[in-house]
Amino acid sequence: MGAARIAPSLALLLCCPVLSSAYALVDADDVFTKEEQIFLLHRAQAQCDKLLKEVLHTAANIMESDKGWTPASTSGKPRKEKASGKFYPESKENKDVPTGSRRRGRPCLPEWDNIVCWPLGAPGEVVAVPCPDYIYDFNHKGHAYRRCDRNGSWEVVPGHNRTWANYSECLKFMTNETREREVFDRLGMIYTVGYSMSLASLTVAVLILAYFRRLHCTRNYIHMHMFLSFMLRAASIFVKDAVLYSGFTLDEAERLTEEELHIIAQVPPPPAAAAVGYAGCRVAVTFFLYFLATNYYWILVEGLYLHSLIFMAFFSEKKYLWGFTIFGWGLPAVFVAVWVGVRATLANTGCWDLSSGHKKWIIQVPILASVVLNFILFINIIRVLATKLRETNAGRCDTRQQYRKLLRSTLVLVPLFGVHYTVFMALPYTEVSGTLWQIQMHYEMLFNSFQGFFVAIIYCFCNGEVQAEIRKSWSRWTLALDFKRKARSGSSSYSYGPMVSHTSVTNVGPRAGLSLPLSPRLPPATTNGHSQLPGHAKPGAPATETETLPVTMAVPKDDGFLNGSCSGLDEEASGSARPPPLLQEEWETVM
């Protein structure tokens, strides 16, 4: 038994949901607007009008003959009519009508009621059709019902001049019983707080890494690019929500009734000239998709970089940094531009939402490929970590300690590789009810929105090198502030940790004619008595590679790349390879 045996079990546990239904990963952020719904309704109406012409022609031939109308069966399930090649939902038997009156008679003519294309109805029977899938928030497993009376007319609502229809099964997802308002309010709060905290923490992290010159190295450059992608993703989500807030929201869906669906369906489709009004939401959706894709690809770049450091003995970091930059920002721009071109030419309607046909795969396939590839890299790195732990700690620690080290390293890598995406990916997004659905949505909203915050905490604020630079900068600032305050009060007393130095102007005789000189023309020992103290550097002067602190911080070795120094990691522009001993030191830092 060894720590290396955890890796195969972990791979088997996490790989299945990734390969089974990874496609649901991107659809979680999809937005369905009212304009898109109107477009789908009018497209369904056009298809129904074409079908009605053929069916009415067939019905006229039937009524001209003396054969009457006899339904094929009463099973209530759709079947395919061989004669015309069209689908005709079969009728459900109405037990209130005598059997003899249902055998022959004039059928109810098919028609479009602004929601469903109703087929021919057998006299005296209830016609059931599946809830249309082009109504986004319908329960697509239910049915809508109409009744055809014995005279061959659709039954009307008593006292109203409209046809009776029952859409209760289709509307069950829109009731307050299944879509509880407090659940969605809580999810919205998690969503907003998470992305806000991620945006704020990532902004601070980028400023820290950019400010300190000693933190400038390839590893931190890649971190900064990934942080920036998280920031742009969060900002684009807020902008997209603000632009599309007037769309087909959950509040509207809860209040939606059959009559309102008829009103929506009767709105004429917008003319081509009105497409200019969609420019704002289309730009918002396009930038959201681009920054979403770049975020996934910079997560993949982090995985590729770490994988290359471990498995490549000669790895030119500066040389590959440009390639990583083009890969992370340029490749998503290519397939997003292709998607924009396809939408603009083939489906230039509404706000260019992803849910329009199979065109969404132009963006989803590259993103899902990056997720699967990053997951494979994660499993391989965990496998190597387990092997190295078993080899380096053989005979020095027990198995439980090895497991704890492996678990700690794994948890550090989880937010970097986005492994949390795989937990609920096998569950469909259509089941908008139940305890399991609520657990899934709370989990995904929490980790998706807070992922940037976790990454900033682990890879910047908990980085020992970053903490050391902040302490040095704080000590220099407080020392300079204390020196200025003492100088204004007539004393040059200052302190540096436990060390105290004091030079007073009263120690100089009045006959000497001297005052406390603060000019840099004096020797360093006189003008700046603390210049030889540990860690001192002139304000504004760049740090040198030879500058070291006499007292170093104890950094745990198994914190991985969190506390690795930037010194010595980057190579010269000539692309000289790192010697094998340095690679071994880097590997020991990982462990």
Swiss-Prot record:
Segments on the Extracellular face: 27-188, 240-282, 343-361, 429-440
Residues making up the signal peptide according to the UniProt record: 1-26
Domain of life, source organism: Eukaryota
A Gene Ontology molecular function term of the record: parathyroid hormone receptor activity
Transmembrane regions: 189-212, 220-239, 283-306, 321-342, 362-382, 410-428, 441-463
Motif range (Important for interaction with G proteins): 474-477
GO cellular component terms given for this protein: apical plasma membrane; basolateral plasma membrane; brush border membrane; plasma membrane; receptor complex
GO biological process, one term: adenylate cyclase-modulating G protein-coupled receptor signaling pathway
Topological type in the membrane: Multi-pass membrane protein
SUPFAM superfamilies reported for this sequence: Family A G protein-coupled receptor-like, Hormone receptor domain
Region described as Disordered: 67-104, 516-544
PROSITE patterns recorded: G_PROTEIN_RECEP_F2_1, G_PROTEIN_RECEP_F2_2, G_PROTEIN_RECEP_F2_3, G_PROTEIN_RECEP_F2_4
This protein's record includes keyword Methyltransferase: no
Compositionally biased region (Basic and acidic residues): 81-96
Modification(s) after translation: N-glycosylated.
Cystine pairings recorded for this chain: C48-C117, C108-C148, C131-C170
Membrane topology, Cytoplasmic segments: 213-219, 307-320, 383-409, 464-591
Pfam families assigned: 7tm_2, HRM
Residues carrying covalently attached carbohydrate according to the record: N151, N161, N166, N176
Annotated localization: Cell membrane
Alphabetic keyword roster: Cell membrane, Disulfide bond, G-protein coupled receptor, Glycoprotein, Membrane, Receptor, Signal, Transducer, Transmembrane, Transmembrane helix
Homology family: Belongs to the G-protein coupled receptor 2 family.
Summary of the function given for this chain in its UniProt record: G-protein-coupled receptor for parathyroid hormone (PTH) and for parathyroid hormone-related peptide (PTHLH). Ligand binding causes a conformation change that triggers signaling via guanine nucleotide-binding proteins (G proteins) and modulates the activity of downstream effectors, such as adenylate cyclase (cAMP). PTH1R is coupled to G(s) G alpha proteins and mediates activation of adenylate cyclase activity. PTHLH dissociates from PTH1R more rapidly than PTH; as consequence, the cAMP response induced by PTHLH decays faster than the response induced by PTH.
Subunit structure: Homodimer in the absence of bound ligand. Peptide hormone binding leads to dissociation of the homodimer.
Name of the protein described by the UniProt record: Parathyroid hormone/parathyroid hormone-related peptide receptor
